[in-house]
Regions:
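Exported/periplasmic ABC-transporter solute-binding proteins
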Residues: 2-33, 37, 41, 46, ...
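Charged, often glycine-rich, active-site loop that binds/positions anionic groups
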Residues: 55-57
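Periplasmic-binding protein-like
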Residues: 59-63
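Short acidic (Asp/Glu) patches
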Residues: 82-89
Length: 212
């Protein structure tokens, strides 16, 4: 066994929405365990899942969605883990925390969007531009559920272009912060970190629980 003060590196793959939180935790953890170096790779959970699948070194995976974790877990149903991947120690899995999906607007809220109802109406008539995550990342998948809740077909929305996409939640918050869009759907934690105004929160009925 290694001596208790031996240098250890832990490679942590974590959803982009965990960036600020984990960096703060790392600073505190360094005081408690100075011999441990935490090396982070932050990106969308879908991208991280692919990197792990392709053999990248990873000691800990924190996914913003259960789907990406299930796809790497041999104990998951074959309907989810369609490739029979075995990259996760099933017994080590824990539900770590819960987040919320919120609707955010840029400074001044020029389109006066106050709720998901307003968002749905604006998307239906093509009067707003909304940022959302790609379909392969959890925040995008939660947004798709919200669209379906309102009976909106993502592919059938006005061809003028009412949707703008981001490869992870940070790209979505950036689009809103830069006022490139009229609103965006992100996690509560990212809205707080980016100083964005959240005007509404999605219920579990709208998009299900957001479990990491």
């Amino acid at each position: 066994a290694e001596p208790p003060d031996a240098s250890i590196e832990l490679i942590v793959y974590a959803a982009a929405s965990m960036t600020e939180t984990l960096q703060e935790i790392a600073g505190l953890y360094a005081e408690a365990a100075p011999n441990v170096t935490l090396t982070f790779n932050f990106d969308s959970s879908g991208t991280l899942k692919t990197q792990i699948q392709e053999g990248a070194d990873c000691d800990l995976f924190i996914s913003a969605g259960q789907k990406q974790m299930d796809q790497l877990d041999i104990a998951s149903s074959p309907e989810v883990n369609t490739e029979g991947l075995d990259f996760v120690d099933t017994d080590s899995r824990v539900d770590l925390l819960e987040n919320r999906v919120v609707l955010v607007v840029p400074d001044g809220n020029p389109k006066d969007i106050q709720s998901f109802d307003d968002m749905a109406a604006g998307l239906s008539d093509g009067s707003i531009l909304m940022a959302m995550g790609n379909s392969d990342v959890p925040v995008g998948q939660y947004t798709q559920k919200i669209l379906r809740y309102y009976g909106l077909d993502e592919d059938a929305l006005p061809p003028s272009g009412v949707l703008s996409y981001g490869t992870n939640v940070k790209e979505v918050t950036t689009q809103v912060s830069e006022q490139s869009v009229d609103c965006g759907v992100v996690y509560c934690t990212d809205a707080f970190s980016a100083g964005l105004t959240g005007v509404d929160s999605a219920t579990a009925e709208m998009c299900g629980p957001v479990i990491y």
